[in-house]
């Protein structure tokens, strides 16, 4: 929907589908994404990141996201703590992305959480 502060598209029906899955008996809501993408310079960039850049648009609150799927698996997020959610997301990140709990802690403690978009 946005790249940083630049608006790219509208919200569409994402919230309608998430709300329907959330409220229906036995319903399950999935966000399906590619784990990574190639940047213009050819480098691999993870789509699973520890933070989003300031000013980015967020369509759905985290409380509405039940599951996220990539080509490396499904992260079931319902009822989990923030740390458990992060660990579940790291588990479905691209294996070459360098995502790990220890790398995220290190980046956070050294204030090196630059998210290149």
Q: What is the predicted role of each segment?
A:
Residues 1-117:
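Conserved phosphate- and dinucleotide-binding cores of soluble alpha/beta proteins
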């Amino acid at each position: 929907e946005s790249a940083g502060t630049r608006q790219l598209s509208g919200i569409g029906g994402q919230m309608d589908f998430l709300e329907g899955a959330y409220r229906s008996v036995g319903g399950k809501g999935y966000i399906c994404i590619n784990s990574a993408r190639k940047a213009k310079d050819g480098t691999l960039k993870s789509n699973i990141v520890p933070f989003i850049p300031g000013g980015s648009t967020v369509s759905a609150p985290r409380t509405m996201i039940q599951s996220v799927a990539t080509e490396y698996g499904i992260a079931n997020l319902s009822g989990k703590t923030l740390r458990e959610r992060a660990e579940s997301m790291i588990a479905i990140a691209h294996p070459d992305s360098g995502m790990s709990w220890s790398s995220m802690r290190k980046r956070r403690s050294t204030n090196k959480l630059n998210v290149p978009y």
